[in-house]
A protein has these predicted regions:
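A short, well-structured alpha-helix characteristic of acyl/acetyltransferase catalytic modules
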Residues: 10-20
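Conserved active-site tyrosine of GNAT-family acetyltransferases
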Residues: 17, 109, 114
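Conserved beta-strand in the GNAT
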Residues: 46-54, 59-66
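Conserved acetyl-CoA-binding loop-helix of GNAT-fold acetyltransferases
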Residues: 73-86, 111
Length: 138
């Protein structure tokens, strides 16, 4: 056996680790992960916002939310989130979850109906981290 400490992890290794974990999880919960994203582009085709995640375990796991600075506050983020939530509900999801940092958008997610279900705070030099959940009529 050889154990290595890596300072960088390439995409292939990261994906292999994720695949092995999902295979293990699948042996306990017979459900697979389905990618889901909603994106917005401007008239020139430039990406101006997006929400990306996956549906699994009857939940929408939101992994990335980004809106270009000049489009923040325009309602674009809310529209992208709503589109993903609608599709997640069609897929049988009962809730959505995400995590965010204190300098990112916890207030935005609260406006979307998410509630803080856990947090990590008080670590010097580190932003607070919030774990948030939104239940869909269940």
């Amino acid at each position: 056996m050889q154990i290595d400490l890596l300072q960088q992890v390439d995409d292939d290794l990261q994906n292999e680790l994720i695949d092995k974990l999902r295979t293990y999880n699948h042996s306990y919960i017979n459900e697979s992960s389905q990618p889901l994203a909603a994106i917005a582009r401007d008239s020139e085709g430039q990406l101006i916002g997006g929400v990306s995640g996956r549906s699994i375990y009857r939940q929408l796991l939101i992994e990335v939310v980004w809106v270009a600075k000049e489009h923040r506050g325009s309602g674009l983020g809310s529209r992208l989130m709503a589109l993903c939530e609608q599709e997640a509900i069609k897929r049988g999801c009962l809730a959505a979850q995400l995590d965010t940092l204190s300098f990112q958008a916890p207030a935005f997610y609260a406006k979307q109906g998410f509630e803080v279900v856990g947090s990590v705070s008080g670590i010097p030099g580190s932003p607070d981290r919030y774990f948030m959940c939104k239940r869909f009529n269940c």
